[in-house]
Structures are given as C-alpha cells and as structure tokens.
Amino acid sequence: MITARQVRAARALLDWTQDTLAEEALVSLTALKRLEDRRELKVHESTRVQVQRALEKAGIVFIATEGGRGVMLVQRPNATVMS
C-alpha cells in the first residue's frame, strides 16, 4: 500500500501539481488531497490504485524495504511526463 508521503514525493519528482496527478489518475482533486493528507485519512482503495498506476506510468518506482519506504524516478523511453 502506497503512503501519503510516497505520493507527495513522487509528485515532487515529476514536478506535477495535485491537479495534474488527479487528472492523470482519473480521480477527483478532493480524493487525491485526502490520499496525500499527513493525517492519513481514509480513502477508497481504487483511488490509491489509480494514483499508483498513473505515477508508475510516468516512471515512478515505489520502494518498500525493512529500512522504510520511498520512491524513485526511472526514465522510461515511452514515459510521458507532464508539467
């Protein structure tokens, strides 16, 4: 399960606004704001999945190890990065 911090960090790596990510993920801006909230508000699992897929399509890789969670940007030949 991706975390609010991972989503915010991924968006920063892509230089995307919340509006851009919401549009790419086909979720409402309100749903995305709930997902990114530091208080870890409850969100629909479908929202989480759609956001993760949109970020992965743009080249984000989600990392989860015993040492913690994170993200990294991998440039893919066919990745479309909007700004």
Question: How would you label these PLM feature ranges?
Answer:
Residues W16-R34:
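Short alpha-helical DNA-recognition segment
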Residues E45-F62:
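DNA major-groove recognition helix of helix-turn-helix/homeodomain DNA-binding modules
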Residues S28, R38-R39, A58:
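The DNA-recognition helices of helix-turn-helix-type DNA-binding domains
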Residues V7-T20, R76, V81:
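Short basic helix-loop element that most often maps to the first helix and adjoining turn
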Residues M1-A12, I63:
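A short, Lys/Arg-rich alpha-helix, primarily the initiator
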Residues I60-S83:
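Helix-turn-helix/homeodomain-like alpha-helical modules used for DNA recognition
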